[in-house]
């Protein structure tokens, strides 16, 4: 291995350790992470959903289930995850003011607070990576 490979290996090991300790094996992680880390689709959905919310976009049911490519989950699975997140009080569901049949989704205050704690911890602990 040459010098560049040693640097790459060092960075790769730091990244892997950071992901394992901060994302997967961290006992301080909020409860919502257990739900959203259960499979690839849920984690992808969480990140996409939070991105859209933080960008200020209104998130309808159809928009929410379209955030993640279809190859990760069927339409039924996508709807089930959204509805389960609502039942678990991670995401709130309200009727649109314009069209009462249309449902609008937002993260709950608890999810927002826990998500920001989670991202702050990862950011602080990964600055050295």
Describe the role of every protein-language-model region.
Residues 55-68:
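Short acidic, hydrophobic short linear motifs in intrinsically disordered regions
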């Amino acid at each position: 291995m040459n010098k560049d490979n040693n640097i790459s290996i060092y960075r790769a090991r730091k990244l892997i350790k950071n992901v394992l300790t901060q994302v997967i094996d961290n006992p301080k992680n909020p409860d919502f992470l257990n739900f959203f880390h259960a499979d690839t689709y849920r984690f992808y959905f969480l990140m996409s959903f939070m991105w859209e919310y933080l960008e200020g976009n209104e998130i309808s049911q159809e928009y929410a289930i379209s955030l993640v490519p279809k190859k990760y989950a069927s339409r039924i699975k996508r709807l089930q995850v959204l509805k389960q997140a609502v039942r678990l009080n991670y995401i709130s569901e309200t009727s649109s003011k314009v069209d009462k049949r249309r449902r609008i989704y937002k993260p709950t205050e608890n999810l927002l607070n826990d998500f920001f704690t989670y991202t702050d911890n990862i950011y602080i602990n990964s600055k050295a990576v």
